[in-house]
Amino acid sequence: MPAAAAGPMGEMSPAGYHAGMSTQIDDPQIAPFSKFRDLTADIHVTMLTTRRADGLLHSRPMGTRAIESDGALWFFTADDSGKVNEIYHDQMVNVSYIKPGDQVYVSVAGKASLSRDRAKIRELWTPVLKTWFSEGVDDPNLALLRVDIVAIDYWEGPGKIVSLLKFAKSAVTGTPSKVGEYGTIVPPPKT
């Protein structure tokens, strides 16, 4: 997969997304995330939403660096960025994944925290990050944002053509049409 990039302050879309994803689904702590990983496998840029001090919501694009088997999402960030300050005041965030061509929409409610764990930074590091962190893994401003998933809502449609045909059939027959799948995933409490 080619490397891609987005914005400043660690808000990026690096190569190597979803590194370390587990395919094991028999563990009750892991199974809920199987559907989530399937839905987001090809979505590389997300929107992370935090709450500002004045109460307004603030969203910015981020690149998911990893989705752990326990549902933790990892993002690189600058530890002096505005989002970090917002998270210190309110840890609840939303992460949105959208793939409009396939009619996939995922909304993740989670609890965010900042990590300066150098071992984890080295594990998730990719050279494209030097664009924002010129000193590499030793950049003193480099940190990780961890989002622990609280709940996931998703909508998955059959695609544009099938959706249009179902809408047309519904208009002609006057009966509502189920155009896609909606679901909520609430992971079990961590043990």
Predicted regions and their residues:
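A short, Trp-centered hydrophobic/proline-enriched beta-strand micro-motif
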Residues: 38-53, 93-97
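Compositionally biased low-complexity segments, especially N-terminal hydrophobic helices
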Residues: 1-8
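C-terminal edge-of-domain segments
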Residues: 9-27, 138-191
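Short active-site oxyanion
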Residues: 69-74
